[in-house]
Design a protein with these regions (language model features):
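Conserved hydrophobic/aromatic "anchor" residues
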Residues: 12, 17, 124-126, 154
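Glycine-rich beta-to-alpha transition loops that act as phosphate-gripper elements at the mouths
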Residues: 65, 138-141
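Short, solvent-exposed alpha-helical surface patches in well-structured domains
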Residues: 24-27, 36, 116, 120, ...
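Conserved acetyl-CoA-binding loop-helix of GNAT-fold acetyltransferases
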Residues: 103-104, 110-127, 143-151
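Conserved catalytic-core motifs of GNAT/GCN5-like acyltransferases
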Residues: 137, 155-171, 188
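GNAT-family acyltransferases
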Residues: 1-110, 170-191
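Conserved GNAT acetyl-CoA-binding A-motif
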Residues: 128-137
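Conserved beta-strand edge residues that scaffold enzyme active sites
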Residues: 43, 91, 139-140, 163
């Protein structure tokens, strides 16, 4: 049974993460095409379950739903009108500026699903929390992620040099921010 729908866009839906989603998250997290750009360590299913209980960010599964997705479905999905393609999370929203994290399975990179998913998450943050801004980080070598943030109006705010050892090299973390008024203005200009 899929988790509750939190937000829907033109093509993607954000849903709550449920226990049945942990195998998908663990398999995706083990994929080097996802793990290395994010700088994440390998974790087993139990570590995913424990981690989610402790950190409890607003984590959402990114899904494609409805007609047109059957060729993309895996054998482990009960609902054949739903395809899990990634995750968007919001951390630290209760006590400081919220930080977004996101990833999609490599098969859907370049299709615009990431931009739509992150936009839905930004909208969620500004509707749910009384915060003046939202932040996100991307490693300096992750050009696609940096372009995604900039396309939504995020502004580079700083660089944490040699922040983490990722994929055989020390990588800088580029920090981005988006003010509430910038988001509201961008949304209003699209109407």
């Amino acid at each position: 049974m899929p988790g509750a729908r939190v937000a829907s866009g033109d093509r993607v839906t954000l849903r709550t993460v449920e226990a049945e989603d942990v195998p998908f998250l663990q398999r995706a997290g083990a994929n080097p095409e996802i793990r290395y750009p994010l700088g994440n360590p390998l974790r087993n299913r139990e570590q995913y379950e424990i981690s989610d209980e402790r950190t409890a960010p607003d984590g959402f599964l990114v899904c494609l739903e409805g007609e047109g997705t059957p060729e993309l479905l895996g054998d482990d999905f009960e609902d054949h009108d739903l395809r899990r393609i990634g995750q968007v999370s919001v951390a630290d929203a209760h006590y400081k500026r919220p930080e977004l994290g996101y990833w999609l399975v490599p098969e859907v990179h370049g299709e615009g699903y990431g931009t739509e998913s992150v936009a839905l998450a930004v909208d969620y943050v500004f509707r749910q929390y009384d915060t003046p801004a939202v932040g996100a980080g991307a490693f300096d070598h992750n050009d696609a992620s940096r372009r995604l943030l900039e396309s939504l109006g995020f502004v580079e705010e700083g660089r944490r040099r040699k922040f983490m050892f990722v994929d055989g090299a020390y990588r800088d973390m580029v920090q981005y921010g988006l003010l509430r008024e910038e988001w509201v203005e961008a949304v209003d200009s699209e109407r």
